[in-house]
Amino acid sequence: MSLGAGPEAGFSSEELLTLRFPLHRACRDGDLPALCALLQSAPRSDLAAEDSFYGWTPIHWAAHFGKLECLMQLVRAGASVNASTTRFAQTPAHIAAFGGHPQCLNWLIQVGANINKQDYVGETPIHKAARSGSVDSISALVAHGAQIDLRNASGLTAADLAHTQGFQECAQFLLNLQNCHLNRYYSNGTLNGGHRNAGPNPFSGGTSRKRSFEDVESAGVKKARTEAYSFDGLIPMMNGGVEDDADNMHVDREFAVVSDMNSSSSILNALTNGCAMNGHLDFTAAQQLSGMDTRQEECLTLAPNGIIPGVTSPSRHRIHTSNGTEEPEKAMNNPTDMCGSLHLNGSPSSCVSNRPSWVEDPGDTLHYGHYHGFGDTAESIPELSSVVEHSNSVKVEQRYDNTVLGTMYLYHGS
Protein backbone atom coordinates (compact mmCIF):
# COMPACT_ATOMS: atom_id res chain seq x y z
CA MET A 1 0.00 0.00 0.00
CA SER A 2 1.35 3.31 -1.01
CA LEU A 3 1.07 5.75 1.89
CA GLY A 4 1.81 8.67 -0.39
CA ALA A 5 -1.17 8.03 -2.71
CA GLY A 6 -4.04 10.48 -2.87
CA PRO A 7 -7.46 9.85 -1.35
CA GLU A 8 -9.30 7.04 -3.02
CA ALA A 9 -12.84 7.39 -4.26
CA GLY A 10 -15.50 5.91 -2.05
CA PHE A 11 -13.59 6.39 1.21
CA SER A 12 -14.06 9.15 3.70
CA SER A 13 -11.09 10.90 5.17
CA GLU A 14 -11.55 9.12 8.49
CA GLU A 15 -11.81 5.70 6.88
CA LEU A 16 -8.83 6.34 4.69
CA LEU A 17 -6.79 7.54 7.67
CA THR A 18 -7.69 4.44 9.67
CA LEU A 19 -7.05 2.02 6.84
CA ARG A 20 -3.96 3.49 5.25
CA PHE A 21 -2.33 5.61 8.01
CA PRO A 22 -2.95 3.86 11.34
CA LEU A 23 0.15 5.40 12.99
CA HIS A 24 -1.04 8.88 12.04
CA ARG A 25 -4.52 8.18 13.37
CA ALA A 26 -3.17 6.81 16.69
CA CYS A 27 -1.04 9.94 17.13
CA ARG A 28 -4.01 12.17 16.32
CA ASP A 29 -6.21 10.50 18.90
CA GLY A 30 -3.48 10.02 21.48
CA ASP A 31 -4.17 6.31 21.50
CA LEU A 32 -1.02 5.24 23.25
CA PRO A 33 -1.74 1.46 23.48
CA ALA A 34 -2.57 1.29 19.77
CA LEU A 35 0.53 3.29 18.93
CA CYS A 36 2.79 1.03 20.99
CA ALA A 37 1.29 -2.05 19.35
CA LEU A 38 1.75 -0.59 15.86
CA LEU A 39 5.34 0.44 16.59
CA GLN A 40 6.20 -3.13 17.52
CA SER A 41 5.01 -4.50 14.17
CA ALA A 42 5.37 -1.59 11.74
CA PRO A 43 8.53 -1.23 9.67
CA ARG A 44 10.86 1.63 10.53
CA SER A 45 10.04 3.33 7.24
CA ASP A 46 6.49 3.97 8.42
CA LEU A 47 7.84 6.48 10.95
CA ALA A 48 8.80 8.78 8.06
CA ALA A 49 5.71 8.11 5.90
CA GLU A 50 3.77 11.24 4.90
CA ASP A 51 -0.02 11.15 4.71
CA SER A 52 -1.94 12.12 1.59
CA PHE A 53 -3.83 14.92 3.35
CA TYR A 54 -1.24 17.26 4.84
CA GLY A 55 2.02 15.61 3.96
CA TRP A 56 2.80 15.00 7.62
CA THR A 57 4.59 12.12 9.29
CA PRO A 58 3.28 10.53 12.51
CA ILE A 59 5.47 12.77 14.69
CA HIS A 60 3.99 15.86 13.01
CA TRP A 61 0.50 14.63 13.83
CA ALA A 62 1.43 14.05 17.47
CA ALA A 63 3.00 17.51 17.66
CA HIS A 64 0.00 19.24 16.07
CA PHE A 65 -2.47 17.70 18.51
CA GLY A 66 -0.20 18.04 21.54
CA LYS A 67 0.17 14.34 22.31
CA LEU A 68 3.34 14.41 24.35
CA GLU A 69 3.32 10.68 25.24
CA CYS A 70 3.03 9.77 21.58
CA LEU A 71 5.95 12.06 20.76
CA MET A 72 8.06 10.25 23.32
CA GLN A 73 7.18 6.84 21.97
CA LEU A 74 7.86 7.87 18.38
CA VAL A 75 11.27 9.34 19.21
CA ARG A 76 12.12 6.26 21.26
CA ALA A 77 11.20 4.15 18.27
CA GLY A 78 13.55 6.14 16.04
CA ALA A 79 11.60 9.10 14.66
CA SER A 80 13.64 12.26 14.06
CA VAL A 81 12.73 15.37 16.04
CA ASN A 82 13.88 17.49 13.09
CA ALA A 83 12.00 15.55 10.43
CA SER A 84 11.16 17.98 7.62
CA THR A 85 8.09 17.54 5.43
CA THR A 86 8.57 17.32 1.69
CA ARG A 87 5.85 19.76 0.79
CA PHE A 88 6.46 22.64 3.22
CA ALA A 89 9.81 21.79 4.85
CA GLN A 90 8.24 21.99 8.29
CA THR A 91 9.54 20.26 11.41
CA PRO A 92 7.56 18.98 14.42
CA ALA A 93 8.60 22.19 16.21
CA HIS A 94 6.84 24.26 13.52
CA ILE A 95 3.71 22.16 13.91
CA ALA A 96 3.71 22.19 17.74
CA ALA A 97 4.22 25.97 17.78
CA PHE A 98 1.35 26.55 15.39
CA GLY A 99 -0.84 24.18 17.40
CA GLY A 100 -0.05 26.08 20.62
CA HIS A 101 1.50 23.27 22.64
CA PRO A 102 4.36 24.68 24.75
CA GLN A 103 4.86 21.41 26.66
CA CYS A 104 5.53 19.52 23.45
CA LEU A 105 7.81 22.35 22.31
CA ASN A 106 9.82 22.22 25.52
CA TRP A 107 10.28 18.49 25.24
CA LEU A 108 11.24 18.64 21.56
CA ILE A 109 13.80 21.34 22.33
CA GLN A 110 15.26 19.26 25.14
CA VAL A 111 15.79 16.30 22.83
CA GLY A 112 17.47 18.40 20.14
CA ALA A 113 14.88 20.16 18.00
CA ASN A 114 16.14 23.06 15.89
CA ILE A 115 13.92 25.99 16.85
CA ASN A 116 15.42 28.41 14.33
CA LYS A 117 14.97 26.23 11.25
CA GLN A 118 13.09 28.01 8.45
CA ASP A 119 10.44 26.33 6.34
CA TYR A 120 9.73 26.87 2.64
CA VAL A 121 8.44 30.42 3.25
CA GLY A 122 11.32 31.32 5.55
CA GLU A 123 9.38 31.00 8.78
CA THR A 124 10.69 29.53 12.02
CA PRO A 125 8.59 27.98 14.81
CA ILE A 126 8.20 31.40 16.44
CA HIS A 127 6.55 32.71 13.27
CA LYS A 128 4.08 29.83 13.45
CA ALA A 129 3.34 30.57 17.10
CA ALA A 130 2.73 34.22 16.20
CA ARG A 131 0.34 33.21 13.42
CA SER A 132 -1.79 31.33 15.93
CA GLY A 133 -1.36 33.92 18.71
CA SER A 134 0.17 31.45 21.16
CA VAL A 135 1.99 33.55 23.73
CA ASP A 136 2.88 30.45 25.76
CA SER A 137 4.59 28.86 22.78
CA ILE A 138 6.46 32.09 22.06
CA SER A 139 7.62 32.25 25.67
CA ALA A 140 8.86 28.67 25.53
CA LEU A 141 10.76 29.34 22.31
CA VAL A 142 12.30 32.59 23.54
CA ALA A 143 13.33 30.94 26.80
CA HIS A 144 15.38 28.48 24.77
CA GLY A 145 17.04 31.05 22.53
CA ALA A 146 14.71 31.45 19.58
CA GLN A 147 15.53 34.42 17.34
CA ILE A 148 12.59 36.80 17.38
CA ASP A 149 13.95 39.25 14.82
CA LEU A 150 14.17 36.81 11.90
CA ARG A 151 12.10 37.75 8.84
CA ASN A 152 10.27 35.39 6.55
CA ALA A 153 10.37 35.44 2.75
CA SER A 154 7.96 38.39 2.78
CA GLY A 155 10.18 40.40 5.14
CA LEU A 156 7.87 40.01 8.13
CA THR A 157 8.91 39.27 11.69
CA ALA A 158 6.87 37.25 14.15
CA ALA A 159 5.50 40.50 15.62
CA ASP A 160 4.36 41.59 12.16
CA LEU A 161 2.56 38.30 11.62
CA ALA A 162 0.81 38.47 14.99
CA HIS A 163 -0.36 42.00 14.19
CA THR A 164 -1.54 40.95 10.74
CA GLN A 165 -3.53 38.04 12.18
CA GLY A 166 -5.17 40.33 14.75
CA PHE A 167 -3.38 39.06 17.86
CA GLN A 168 -2.54 42.47 19.31
CA GLU A 169 -1.54 41.20 22.75
CA CYS A 170 0.81 38.70 21.18
CA ALA A 171 2.19 41.35 18.84
CA GLN A 172 2.88 43.73 21.73
CA PHE A 173 4.53 40.94 23.67
CA LEU A 174 6.82 40.22 20.73
CA LEU A 175 7.61 43.89 20.24
CA ASN A 176 8.61 44.20 23.87
CA LEU A 177 10.84 41.16 23.54
CA GLN A 178 12.31 42.57 20.35
CA ASN A 179 13.14 45.87 22.02
CA CYS A 180 14.77 44.07 24.92
CA HIS A 181 16.75 41.99 22.47
CA LEU A 182 17.93 45.00 20.48
CA ASN A 183 18.83 46.91 23.63
CA ARG A 184 20.25 44.09 25.70
CA TYR A 185 23.61 45.86 25.84
CA TYR A 186 21.94 48.19 28.33
CA SER A 187 21.64 45.34 30.83
CA ASN A 188 24.94 46.40 32.35
CA GLY A 189 24.72 50.01 31.23
CA THR A 190 22.90 53.20 32.06
CA LEU A 191 19.41 51.70 32.24
CA ASN A 192 20.39 49.37 35.07
CA GLY A 193 22.72 51.41 37.18
CA GLY A 194 25.75 51.24 34.89
CA HIS A 195 28.47 53.80 34.20
CA ARG A 196 29.57 53.58 37.78
CA ASN A 197 32.77 55.37 36.94
CA ALA A 198 30.96 58.41 35.61
CA GLY A 199 30.50 59.86 39.09
CA PRO A 200 27.52 59.95 41.41
CA ASN A 201 24.26 61.50 40.47
CA PRO A 202 23.63 64.55 42.65
CA PHE A 203 19.92 63.84 42.64
CA SER A 204 20.20 60.20 43.62
CA GLY A 205 21.83 60.63 46.95
CA GLY A 206 24.85 58.68 45.80
CA THR A 207 28.17 58.70 47.52
CA SER A 208 30.27 61.76 46.83
CA ARG A 209 33.45 63.22 48.22
CA LYS A 210 31.40 64.80 51.01
CA ARG A 211 31.29 62.76 54.17
CA SER A 212 27.87 61.60 55.20
CA PHE A 213 26.07 63.06 58.18
CA GLU A 214 26.14 59.67 59.91
CA ASP A 215 29.90 59.41 59.53
CA VAL A 216 30.40 62.77 61.18
CA GLU A 217 27.95 62.05 63.96
CA SER A 218 29.63 58.75 64.74
CA ALA A 219 32.92 60.57 65.18
CA GLY A 220 31.36 62.97 67.68
CA VAL A 221 31.83 65.94 65.38
CA LYS A 222 29.01 67.61 63.53
CA LYS A 223 29.35 68.29 59.82
CA ALA A 224 28.57 71.42 57.83
CA ARG A 225 25.17 71.86 56.22
CA THR A 226 24.57 73.81 53.08
CA GLU A 227 20.85 74.27 53.60
CA ALA A 228 21.12 76.46 56.74
CA TYR A 229 19.32 79.78 56.47
CA SER A 230 21.76 81.88 54.41
CA PHE A 231 24.63 80.91 56.66
CA ASP A 232 27.00 80.23 53.81
CA GLY A 233 29.40 82.83 55.16
CA LEU A 234 29.47 81.64 58.75
CA ILE A 235 32.60 79.53 59.05
CA PRO A 236 33.54 77.71 62.24
CA MET A 237 36.86 79.00 63.62
CA MET A 238 39.53 76.93 65.21
CA ASN A 239 43.08 78.08 66.03
CA GLY A 240 42.66 81.08 63.75
CA GLY A 241 42.29 79.04 60.56
CA VAL A 242 39.78 77.37 58.30
CA GLU A 243 39.67 74.10 56.45
CA ASP A 244 40.56 74.12 52.79
CA ASP A 245 37.65 71.86 51.97
CA ALA A 246 34.69 73.83 50.63
CA ASP A 247 32.35 71.37 52.33
CA ASN A 248 33.25 72.91 55.70
CA MET A 249 32.60 76.49 54.60
CA HIS A 250 29.02 76.38 55.90
CA VAL A 251 27.35 76.19 59.27
CA ASP A 252 27.08 72.67 60.59
CA ARG A 253 24.15 72.90 62.90
CA GLU A 254 20.61 73.62 61.78
CA PHE A 255 19.68 76.75 63.66
CA ALA A 256 16.19 77.56 64.94
CA VAL A 257 13.87 79.28 62.50
CA VAL A 258 13.66 82.98 63.19
CA SER A 259 10.08 84.21 63.37
CA ASP A 260 10.90 87.80 64.29
CA MET A 261 14.34 89.24 63.62
CA ASN A 262 13.63 92.22 65.88
CA SER A 263 12.81 90.17 68.99
CA SER A 264 16.44 89.12 69.49
CA SER A 265 15.17 86.15 71.47
CA SER A 266 16.31 83.26 69.37
CA ILE A 267 19.70 81.67 69.07
CA LEU A 268 19.83 82.69 65.44
CA ASN A 269 19.67 86.40 66.30
CA ALA A 270 22.44 85.97 68.81
CA LEU A 271 24.62 84.19 66.33
CA THR A 272 23.96 86.59 63.48
CA ASN A 273 23.85 89.91 65.34
CA GLY A 274 25.82 89.21 68.52
CA CYS A 275 29.33 90.32 69.42
CA ALA A 276 32.36 88.26 70.30
CA MET A 277 33.60 88.31 73.87
CA ASN A 278 36.38 86.07 75.14
CA GLY A 279 36.02 83.95 72.08
CA HIS A 280 32.27 83.43 72.61
CA LEU A 281 29.06 85.18 71.70
CA ASP A 282 27.43 87.50 74.22
CA PHE A 283 23.63 87.35 74.15
CA THR A 284 23.13 90.52 76.19
CA ALA A 285 25.17 92.63 73.84
CA ALA A 286 23.36 91.07 70.91
CA GLN A 287 20.03 92.28 72.22
CA GLN A 288 21.28 95.88 72.22
CA LEU A 289 21.58 95.89 68.48
CA SER A 290 18.50 97.38 66.79
CA GLY A 291 17.69 99.38 63.73
CA MET A 292 20.46 97.89 61.65
CA ASP A 293 19.92 95.97 58.46
CA THR A 294 19.49 92.37 59.55
CA ARG A 295 19.99 91.11 56.04
CA GLN A 296 23.41 92.69 55.76
CA GLU A 297 24.44 91.26 59.12
CA GLU A 298 22.88 87.89 58.50
CA CYS A 299 26.23 86.12 58.48
CA LEU A 300 29.40 86.44 60.49
CA THR A 301 32.08 85.87 57.88
CA LEU A 302 35.81 85.53 57.75
CA ALA A 303 38.08 88.46 57.28
CA PRO A 304 40.65 88.14 54.51
CA ASN A 305 43.23 87.12 57.09
CA GLY A 306 41.02 84.26 58.25
CA ILE A 307 39.87 85.81 61.56
CA ILE A 308 36.42 87.06 62.49
CA PRO A 309 36.59 90.67 63.77
CA GLY A 310 36.35 90.57 67.52
CA VAL A 311 37.22 86.87 67.72
CA THR A 312 40.85 86.09 68.40
CA SER A 313 43.01 83.05 68.25
CA PRO A 314 42.96 80.74 71.27
CA SER A 315 46.31 81.95 72.55
CA ARG A 316 45.60 85.69 72.54
CA HIS A 317 42.41 87.75 72.85
CA ARG A 318 42.08 91.05 70.99
CA ILE A 319 39.34 93.70 70.69
CA HIS A 320 38.86 96.05 67.77
CA THR A 321 38.86 99.74 68.72
CA SER A 322 37.04 102.56 66.99
CA ASN A 323 40.04 103.50 64.87
CA GLY A 324 40.33 100.01 63.46
CA THR A 325 43.37 98.94 65.52
CA GLU A 326 43.50 95.98 67.81
CA GLU A 327 43.98 96.31 71.55
CA PRO A 328 45.66 93.28 73.09
CA GLU A 329 44.28 91.98 76.35
CA LYS A 330 45.59 89.48 78.79
CA ALA A 331 46.41 86.04 77.57
CA MET A 332 43.63 83.53 77.93
CA ASN A 333 43.78 80.19 79.56
CA ASN A 334 43.37 77.00 77.62
CA PRO A 335 40.18 77.63 75.62
CA THR A 336 38.98 74.13 76.34
CA ASP A 337 38.45 75.24 79.92
CA MET A 338 36.26 78.14 78.82
CA CYS A 339 33.44 76.15 77.36
CA GLY A 340 30.47 77.51 79.31
CA SER A 341 30.55 81.20 78.50
CA LEU A 342 27.92 80.96 75.81
CA HIS A 343 25.21 80.44 78.43
CA LEU A 344 26.38 82.91 81.09
CA ASN A 345 24.15 85.74 79.93
CA GLY A 346 20.56 84.80 80.62
CA SER A 347 20.45 81.31 79.20
CA PRO A 348 18.17 79.05 81.27
CA SER A 349 20.67 76.24 80.95
CA SER A 350 23.62 78.22 82.26
CA CYS A 351 25.59 76.18 84.74
CA VAL A 352 29.33 76.64 84.74
CA SER A 353 31.78 78.98 83.10
CA ASN A 354 34.61 76.49 83.17
CA ARG A 355 34.53 72.93 82.03
CA PRO A 356 33.79 70.60 84.96
CA SER A 357 36.72 68.56 86.18
CA TRP A 358 34.75 65.33 85.83
CA VAL A 359 34.42 65.80 82.08
CA GLU A 360 37.04 64.10 79.99
CA ASP A 361 39.43 66.38 78.13
CA PRO A 362 37.73 67.02 74.79
CA GLY A 363 40.96 68.09 73.18
CA ASP A 364 40.48 70.61 70.42
CA THR A 365 36.90 69.75 69.55
CA LEU A 366 35.12 72.02 72.06
CA HIS A 367 37.07 75.26 71.66
CA TYR A 368 33.94 77.13 70.69
CA GLY A 369 31.34 74.75 72.00
CA HIS A 370 29.69 74.85 75.41
CA TYR A 371 28.98 72.36 78.10
CA HIS A 372 26.18 72.62 80.61
CA GLY A 373 25.71 69.06 81.71
CA PHE A 374 22.45 68.26 79.91
CA GLY A 375 23.77 67.30 76.49
CA ASP A 376 20.98 68.91 74.51
CA THR A 377 22.82 71.87 73.03
CA ALA A 378 26.50 71.08 73.45
CA GLU A 379 28.25 71.48 70.15
CA SER A 380 31.61 70.33 68.92
CA ILE A 381 33.07 72.06 65.92
CA PRO A 382 35.71 70.15 63.96
CA GLU A 383 39.21 71.53 63.73
CA LEU A 384 39.80 73.44 60.52
CA SER A 385 42.94 74.05 58.51
CA SER A 386 44.61 77.40 57.85
CA VAL A 387 43.84 77.92 54.16
CA VAL A 388 40.86 79.94 52.94
CA GLU A 389 39.53 78.69 49.64
CA HIS A 390 39.85 81.23 46.91
CA SER A 391 36.32 80.55 45.68
CA ASN A 392 34.82 82.07 48.85
CA SER A 393 37.13 85.07 49.15
CA VAL A 394 34.87 87.41 47.19
CA LYS A 395 31.87 86.70 49.39
CA VAL A 396 33.97 87.07 52.53
CA GLU A 397 35.30 90.43 51.35
CA GLN A 398 31.80 91.78 50.74
CA ARG A 399 30.57 90.97 54.23
CA TYR A 400 33.69 91.85 56.14
CA ASP A 401 32.99 95.60 56.31
CA ASN A 402 29.46 95.03 57.60
CA THR A 403 30.76 92.76 60.35
CA VAL A 404 33.40 95.29 61.43
CA LEU A 405 30.81 98.06 61.63
CA GLY A 406 28.47 95.86 63.62
CA THR A 407 31.20 94.93 66.09
CA MET A 408 32.24 98.56 66.57
CA TYR A 409 28.61 99.54 67.13
CA LEU A 410 28.18 96.89 69.82
CA TYR A 411 31.33 97.84 71.70
CA HIS A 412 31.10 101.61 71.48
CA GLY A 413 27.41 102.28 70.94
CA SER A 414 28.19 104.70 68.14
From Swiss-Prot:
It holds the Pfam family Ank_4. The keyword Transmembrane helix does not apply. InterPro entries: Ank_Repeat/CDKN_Inhibitor (IPR050776), Ankyrin_rpt (IPR002110), Ankyrin_rpt-contain_sf (IPR036770). Keywords: ANK repeat, Repeat. The keyword 4Fe-4S does not apply. GO terms for biological process: protein targeting to chloroplast. Disulfide bonds: none annotated. PROSITE patterns: ANK_REP_REGION (PS50297), ANK_REPEAT (PS50088). Residues 310-332 are annotated as: Disordered. One of its GO terms (molecular function) is chloroplast targeting sequence binding. Gene3D superfamilies: Ankyrin repeat-containing domain. ANK repeats lie at residues 18-47, 54-83, 88-117, 121-150, 154-187. It comes from the Eukaryota. This is Ankyrin repeat domain-containing protein 10. It comes from Gallus gallus (Chicken).
